[in-house]
């Protein structure tokens, strides 16, 4: 597929300062390693003052990085999934659709490498980063987040049958045709789960690539959001096709 036909969305909620630190190395890494990938920041209901400040900073960066698009925003917090879908709607011609978290926990080089891998693929597939210490990658996580992630992913394996060690890593890339074939419902953090479940139902391979990761303070995944994620997983099991359980 044409390298230029890739759109990377960065959903951001109260994350402007870390995002502005992340954008220059990200833009440079994409130019050097993944062709002309368009980058679309979507601000998911951050305070108005932050939205104005961030829009001005992005406008300045666009002078050096034309692939960085004007910022999108809306006044109310609607959730990560809603922000991603809002951004993806801006490029109906893109062959590949990607997203990455705004905090810069995923190194820019890892984002570029995964996008380049997808662009070089001979067959459609979902590509996602996974954070695992069982590789030569450097993964630094806060202890409570590490334990919570293990518990959640084990529960997802049992409840939804998704055989992945890390469903919630904020770096994923999917083919546009796959995205266009479904009506998407999850607006929050459960968008990742919906994506993987729909890929399984469609028979689309999922390629998991170990990545380096460095946890950043100030995560927006609160205990309330985690409970909502468990509730969404229950809802998804009721509403989406499940794999066969026997012969």
Predicted regions and their residues:
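Hydrophobic helical membrane-anchoring modules
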Residues: 1-4, 11, 184-247
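A conserved acidic beta->alpha catalytic loop
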Residues: 43-54, 104
């Amino acid at each position: 597929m044409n390298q230029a036909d890739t759109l990377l969305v960065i959903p951001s909620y109260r994350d402007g300062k870390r995002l502005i630190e992340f954008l220059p190395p990200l833009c440079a890494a994409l130019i050097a390693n993944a062709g002309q990938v368009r980058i679309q920041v979507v601000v998911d209901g951050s305070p108005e003052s932050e939205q104005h400040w961030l829009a001005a900073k992005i406008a300045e960066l666009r002078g050096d990085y034309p692939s960085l698009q004007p910022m999108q925003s809306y006044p109310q917090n609607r959730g990560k999934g809603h922000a991603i879908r809002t951004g993806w709607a801006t490029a109906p011609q893109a062959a590949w659709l990607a997203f990455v978290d705004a905090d810069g926990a995923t190194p820019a080089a890892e984002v570029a490498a995964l996008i380049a891998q997808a662009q070089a693929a001979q067959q459609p597939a979902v590509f996602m980063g996974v954070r695992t210490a069982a590789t030569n990658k450097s993964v630094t996580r806060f202890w409570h987040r590490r334990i919570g992630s293990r518990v959640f992913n084990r529960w997802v394996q049992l409840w939804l049958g998704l055989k992945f060690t890390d469903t919630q890593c904020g770096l994923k890339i999917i083919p546009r045709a796959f995205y266009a074939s479904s009506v998407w419902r999850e607006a929050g953090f459960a968008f990742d789960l919906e994506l993987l479940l729909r890929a399984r139902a469609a028979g689309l391979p999922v390629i998991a690539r170990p990545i380096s990761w460095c946890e950043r303070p100030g995560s927006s995944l609160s205990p309330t959001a985690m409970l909502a994620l468990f509730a969404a997983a229950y809802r998804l099991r009721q509403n989406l096709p499940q794999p066969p359980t026997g012969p």
